[in-house]
């Protein structure tokens, strides 16, 4: 009887220990995971402790450089081999070793969301990317759509640069532009009569088709954020849901902006602008 009781006690002890270990792992994972964008910003700035409790300007640890270094080292997607350790080290150094270390500011501009969504267009599911930014609204702020990209619109804006002879004569005004008729005879050649300075605007077409009812929203597939707030740097933020501690909202891309025009080029690339 004693042997049976001893066996039961040992088994129960191992079970309790295993349960405690599992709970500790879950707790550590919870603290390691950056669950929200606001939490990412606070951790980047050194404005919360390991348990997610906020620090305020009156707290000793508020924006502490050692705390920031600790967080910065775990805020990268470690599975992305495209971000070298040297680049990460240089980024962390640039952030922390300046006279006034830069911080992320939720209301500071120079960051925006990329929302990859699915819409139904004329009975067919189509991917459409919405670019969104914060703007002031009354006493607060709100998210607004400021750009749109949809592959299905590309053909509508293509201009055939090989075709010659399709133009309106410079004296057309003397004929009250009666020759405009030929510009609209063929719908595929209308773009030949448009100014070279014209820039395709997918957002206008998107709004027109939304109001007309020819496209209908279905779902959001993925969300990313693009940050240009740190001088000389750009980084992309994406969400990762997977086993382990390297989880949640993490830096998924990092680029050093060395030349004066790098930021403008990168913004055009992100926005799918040629």
Please give the residue ranges for each predicted region.
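Bacterial Sec-dependent N-terminal signal peptides
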Residues: 1-31
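Short, exposed beta-strand/loop patches in secreted or surface proteins that constitute
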Residues: 104-106, 216-218, 240-242
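Short beta-strand edge/turn micro-motifs at domain boundaries
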Residues: 125-182, 188-189, 224-274
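Residue-level detector of intrinsically disordered/flexible regions characterized by low predicted structural confidence
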Residues: 4, 218-220
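Long, acidic/polar, low-complexity amphipathic helices and coiled-coil-like
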Residues: 25-46, 106-158
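Long, ordered, amphipathic alpha-helical scaffolds
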Residues: 213, 220-222
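Core segments of small alpha/beta cavity-forming domains
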Residues: 20-91, 156-209
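Short N-terminal edge-element motif at the start of the domain
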Residues: 55-140
């Amino acid at each position: 009887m004693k042997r049976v009781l001893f066996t039961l006690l040992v088994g129960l002890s191992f079970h309790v220990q295993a349960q405690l270990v599992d709970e500790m792992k879950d707790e550590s994972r919870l603290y390691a995971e950056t669950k929200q964008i606001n939490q990412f910003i606070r951790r980047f700035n050194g404005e919360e402790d390991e348990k997610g409790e906020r620090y305020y300007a009156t707290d000793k640890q508020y924006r502490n450089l050692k705390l920031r270094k600790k967080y910065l080292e775990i805020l990268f997607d470690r599975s992305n081999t495209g971000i070298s350790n040297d680049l990460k080290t240089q980024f962390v150094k640039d952030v922390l070793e300046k006279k006034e270390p830069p911080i992320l500011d939720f209301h500071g501009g120079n960051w925006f969301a990329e929302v990859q969504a699915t819409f139904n267009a004329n009975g067919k599911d189509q991917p459409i990317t919405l670019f969104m930014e914060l703007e002031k609204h009354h006493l607060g702020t709100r998210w607004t759509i400021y750009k749109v990209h949809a592959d299905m619109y590309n053909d509508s804006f293509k201009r055939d640069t090989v075709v010659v002879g399709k133009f309106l004569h410079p004296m057309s005004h003397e004929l009250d532009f009666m020759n405009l008729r030929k510009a609209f005879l063929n719908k595929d050649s209308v773009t030949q009569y448009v100014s070279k300075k014209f820039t395709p605007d997918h957002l206008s077409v998107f709004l027109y088709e939304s109001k007309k009812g020819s496209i209908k929203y279905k779902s959001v597939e993925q969300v990313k954020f693009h940050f240009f707030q740190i001088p000389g740097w750009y980084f992309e933020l994406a969400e990762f849901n997977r086993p382990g501690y390297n989880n949640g909202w993490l830096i998924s891309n990092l680029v050093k902006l060395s030349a004066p025009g790098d930021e403008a080029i990168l913004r055009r690339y992100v926005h799918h602008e040629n």
